Amino acid sequence: MTRREPVQKRSRERVQAILGAARELLAQGGVEALTTRRLASFSGIPVATIYRYFEDRDAIIAAYLDEELASIDRAVEEALLGLDRVTFRSMSAAVAMAHLRHHQAHPEGIPVWFGTRLSTAVHDSVRELDARMAASLHAATRGAGFIEEGPHFGAGLIVRLWDRTFEHIFRIERSAAEQAAIVLDVIDMIASYMERFATPAGIEGISSAEFLKVLRRPAAR
C-alpha cells in the first residue's frame, strides 16, 4: 500500500480532511461503511482527488492506523511523565492503560485494530505497527537497563498478548471499570513474570525524564 505524501499545506489539509471523514464513517458504520464513494460524499472531496493521495481503501485505513498509533504514543509519553520513577511494572501499566483509554475514547478504531474480517493488506499494516511497538518496547527496556537477559521469547510476544487481551476486552460489552480490571490483571501477570529477569534499575526504577530520553532515542540501524 502506497500513498502520495502531501507537501503543500493545502494538500496536507485535504489528507487530514479525508482521514477525518474516514474516522467519522468508521464510527457510524464500521469498516464496511468506509468506501471511497461514501468518503467522497461525506468529505466533499472528489473520488479522483482521494485517489491522488491514497491508492485504495486499504491505504486510507493504513494511514488512519498510523495516526492512531501516533496519538497513542503521545498518550504514553504523557502517562510516563506523570510518574516519579519508571520501573518495568509502572512502565507496563502506563503503556497498557494509555492504550485502553485511547480505545475507550475512539471505539471506531477497535474493529480495525482487532477485527478479523479485514483485507490481508490491513492485517499486514496492523502487524507492521505491532512490530514497531515491539521494537520500541525492546529498545526502551534494554536502553534503560531494566532487563539484561530476558526470557527466550521477545517483546513481540508481549505485544501480541496485549492484542489478544484488548480483542477479548472489546469482544462483548463491558463497563470501563471491568475493562480496566482485566488490563490491571494482565499487567500484574506480565510484570510479575518479567521481574524475574529485571535488574535493580528495572525494580527500583529511573526518573521519567531519564526514561523518556531512552524512549525517544533513534533506533539503531
Q: What is each model feature region?
A:
Residues 1-13, 198-221:
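N-terminal intrinsically disordered/low-complexity leader segments
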Residues 111, 115, 123, 143-189, ...:
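Hydrophobic/aromatic-rich alpha-helical bundle segments in the mid-to-C-terminal region
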Residues 89-94, 104-135, 176:
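Short secondary-structure transition hinges
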Residues 44-54:
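Short hydrophobic/aromatic patch on the recognition helix
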Residues 36, 47-49, 61, 65-69, ...:
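Membrane-embedded alpha-helical bundles of multi-pass transporters/translocases
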Residues 26, 61-68, 75-76, 110, ...:
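Alpha-helical DNA-contacting segments of helix-turn-helix folds
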Residues 63, 77-104, 158, 183:
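Hydrophobic alpha-helical connector segments
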Residues 1-29, 36-38, 42, 59:
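Basic, helix-initiating cap at the start of DNA-binding domains
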